[in-house]
Amino acid sequence: MIKDIIKNAEEKMQKTVTVLKSELGTMKAGRANPSMLDKIQIDYYGSMCPLSQAANISSPEPRVLMITPWEKQLLKEIEKAILKSDLGLNPSNDGSIIRLVIPELTEETRKDLVKKVKKTGEESKVAIRSIRRDANDKIKALKKDGDLSEDQVKKGEDDVQKKTDAIIKEIDKIIVDKEKEILAI
């Protein structure tokens, strides 16, 4: 029972880390990265679908993304979706592909981006702590029901804390790495 609670908490914590990595991947750091476009949805014959499912996205140069749609008639729709997004990129449509040139980041933009990264990291840590609290509450509930002894509860809470500490350490490393990437000129 207690192992299931800990395993469940660990899975939720790992999902939180995966979401963090995904969110940080969409933040532009002066380099072209196809994951920057992950959140862009296009109107594909009346239904919304991710850009990556309607086009090939590649990075032929460090600061250029090239979008090759599966169907040429999607060019205008893709261009419109990129302009509507909060990425601040200007697509260049040549009739068969769309090029996105990622502008150099100014010092001020870099600092703002670092603040965003730290805020996102902090939100992830809060989510991790919430998962820890839920797991500990479930363990304590088992004690109230008489299913666990005080020692088992203490060991369970210690195990949850160890998992929490490891995940928070991983988040800190991810944040520091992203900050270095942003601040590298």
Swiss-Prot record:
It is found in: Cytoplasm. InterPro entries: Ribosome_recyc_fac, Ribosome_recyc_fac_dom, RRF_sf. One of its GO terms (molecular function) is ribosomal large subunit binding. Keywords: Cytoplasm, Protein biosynthesis. SUPFAM superfamilies: Ribosome recycling factor, RRF. GO terms for biological process: translational termination. Disulfide bonds: none annotated. One of its GO terms (cellular component) is cytoplasm. Pfam families: RRF. Belongs to the RRF family. Responsible for the release of ribosomes from messenger RNA at the termination of protein biosynthesis. May increase the efficiency of translation by recycling ribosomes from one round of translation to another. This is Ribosome-recycling factor. It comes from Clostridium botulinum (strain Alaska E43 / Type E3). The gene is frr.
